[in-house]
């Protein structure tokens, strides 16, 4: 009786946080929110919204429940880990074909959320540490990317990849910041020691 109630409550909270976190398959709101919101709002959303939900989920799992509980382990290994891997692969593939930079960065964020959830689903100290480090890195870096994109939009009135042609000459510092941000988000993933 009580155990089933606790498990149902846990599942409801995980689903609620998964919706706020934009965990696949509860991610539908994120690409549209990033694409159609003003860039300043998108910058704030990208830096904080999903990170707060992930942090709440982490605190909930490690403070309210014991991660040694068998049903918590089963839920995370059997449900969260496959969803994280699907998010990492599917969102990355979808992002490749996006010409709208806001949508591209939104799907990139979904893939990065997959990395964070994979670390959490390992239910280990190293997995948790890597999720937290990546959460902070992603928050700062994605905010910087959207700030750079906002500067590009002021100059070109456009958010498509083709509109970036020639901006390296007319906006060298912003273009440099954008390239560094992309490097920090995507190139450093496999080389980070915590993964």
Regions found by a protein language model. Name each.
Residues 1-188:
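Hydrophobic transmembrane alpha-helices and their helix-loop junctions in integral membrane proteins
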């Amino acid at each position: 009786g009580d155990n089933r109630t606790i498990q149902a409550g846990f599942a409801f909270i995980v689903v609620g946080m998964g919706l706020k976190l934009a965990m696949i398959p509860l991610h539908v709101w994120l690409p549209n929110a990033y694409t159609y919101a003003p860039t300043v709002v998108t910058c704030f959303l990208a830096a904080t919204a999903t990170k707060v939900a992930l942090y709440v989920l982490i605190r909930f799992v490690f403070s309210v429940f014991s991660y040694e509980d068998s049903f918590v382990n089963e839920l995370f290994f059997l449900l969260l880990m496959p969803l994280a891997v699907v998010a990492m692969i599917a969102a990355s593939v979808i992002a490749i074909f996006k010409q709208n930079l806001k949508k591209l960065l939104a799907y990139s964020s979904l893939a990065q959320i997959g990395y964070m959830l994979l670390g959490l689903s390992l239910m280990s100290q190293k997995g948790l540490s890597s999720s937290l480090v990546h959460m902070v890195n992603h928050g700062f870096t994605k905010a910087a990317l959207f700030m750079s994109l906002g500067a590009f939009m002021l100059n070109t009135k456009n958010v498509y990849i083709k509109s970036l042609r020639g901006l390296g000459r007319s906006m060298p510092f912003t273009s440099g910041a954008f390239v560094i941000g992309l490097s920090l988000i995507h190139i450093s993933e496999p080389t980070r020691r915590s993964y």
